[in-house]
C-alpha cells in the first residue's frame, strides 16, 4: 500500500489542480493560458528528476533518496499553496515534480529488490493500475475541494499527502538494496550510459515514437482546462468528469493492448 501511495503522488499532482486553473489565473491576474504553463513546468522536473534518482538510489540505497524527494515535495507543495507570484508558482511546480518522481523511480527499484519475477510482474501491474486510476479520480477530488475552499487548499492537501507518505515510509519501509549490490561506479560513468542509449537506434526510434505519443497527451493536459472550461463554459465539476472519461479510456485501451501484444513476437 505504501508503494501505491508513492506511485499515486505523481498523477495526483499533475491532474488534481487542473479544474482550479481558471480561478488561479483570476487570483494571479493572468490569462488561463498563461497559468497553464504550470503544467509543463511540472513535466520539466518530472523528466529531469527521473534521470538522477535511479543512479543515486543504486549508489546510496533506496530509503535516503525517498526521504529527500518526499521532503522536497512537501516543501514545494507548501510554496505552491502560499505564493502570490505566478513565476514562483511555476518554479515551485518544478520542484514539486523533482520530489514527486522519486516515488515512481524508487518504488519500482524496491519492488525489483524484494520480489520474485512472478510476484514482481503482479506488483508492476498494480502500479500501472494505480497510475491509471489516479488521473481519473484526481480532478474530481480537486473540484470537490474547490466547492468548499479556494484552490490553495488543493496544494495543502497534496502537502499533507506527502507528509503521510513520509510517515508511512518511516513505519513500514526498510532498505532493500544491500551493500553488495550497490553500484559504486562514478556518477559520470553511469550518466554516460544515457548518451550511449541515445546513439542506439534500436532504443531511440521506439523512444521517439513513444515520446511523441506521450507529448500529445501532455499537450492535451496543458490545454484542456482553458479549452473546455473557458471555451465551452464547462464548470470545474463537469470538467473533472470529462477529464476522467479520457483517463478511463486511456486505461481501458492499455488493457486492450495486451491482447494483440500477446500474439506478437518481439525481437530481443
Where are these regions (language model features)?
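Extracellular/periplasmic helix-loop-helix junction of adjacent transmembrane segments
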Residues: 20-47
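Extracytoplasmic
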Residues: 5-25, 221-225
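Cytoplasmic helix-loop-helix junction between adjacent transmembrane helices
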Residues: 94-129
Amino acid at each position: 500500500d505504501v508503494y501505491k501511495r508513492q506511485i499515486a503522488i505523481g498523477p495526483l499532482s499533475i491532474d488534481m489542480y487542473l479544474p482550479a486553473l481558471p480561478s488561479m489565473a483570476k487570483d494571479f491576474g493572468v490569462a488561463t493560458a498563461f497559468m497553464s504553463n504550470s503544467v509543463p513546468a511540472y513535466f520539466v522536473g518530472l523528466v529531469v528528476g527521473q534521470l538522477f534518482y535511479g543512479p543515486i538510489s543504486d549508489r546510496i540505497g533506496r530509503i535516503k533518496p525517498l526521504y529527500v524527494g518526499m521532503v522536497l515535495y512537501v516543501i514545494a507543495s507548501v510554496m505552491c499553496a502560499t505564493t502570490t507570484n505566478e513565476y514562483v508558482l511555476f518554479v515551485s511546480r518544478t520542484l514539486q515534480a523533482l520530489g514527486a518522481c522519486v516515488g515512481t523511480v524508487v518504488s519500482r527499484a524496491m519492488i525489483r529488490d524484494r520480489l520474485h519475477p512472478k510476484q514482481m510482474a503482479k506488483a508492476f501491474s498494480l502500479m500501472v493500475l494505480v497510475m491509471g486510476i489516479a488521473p481519473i479520480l484526481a480532478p474530481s477530488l480537486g473540484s470537490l475541494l474547490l466547492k468548499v475552499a479556494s484552490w490553495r487548499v488543493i496544494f495543502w492537501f497534496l502537502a499533507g499527502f506527502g507528509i503521510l507518505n513520509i510517515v508511512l515510509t518511516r513505519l513500514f519501509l526498510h532498505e532493500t538494496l544491500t551493500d553488495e549490490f550497490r553500484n559504486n561506479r562514478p556518477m559520470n560513468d553511469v550518466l554516460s550510459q544515457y548518451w550511449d542509449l541515445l546513439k542506439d537506434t534500436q532504443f531511440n526510434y521506439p523512444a521517439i515514437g513513444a515520446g511523441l505519443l506521450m507529448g500529445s497527451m501532455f499537450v492535451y493536459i496543458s490545454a484542456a482546462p482553458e479549452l473546455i472550461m473557458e471555451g465551452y463554459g464547462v464548470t470545474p465539476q463537469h470538467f473533472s468528469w470529462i477529464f476522467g472519461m479520457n483517463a478511463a479510456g486511456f486505461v481501458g485501451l492499455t488493457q486492450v493492448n495486451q491482447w494483440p501484444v500477446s500474439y506478437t513476437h518481439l525481437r530481443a
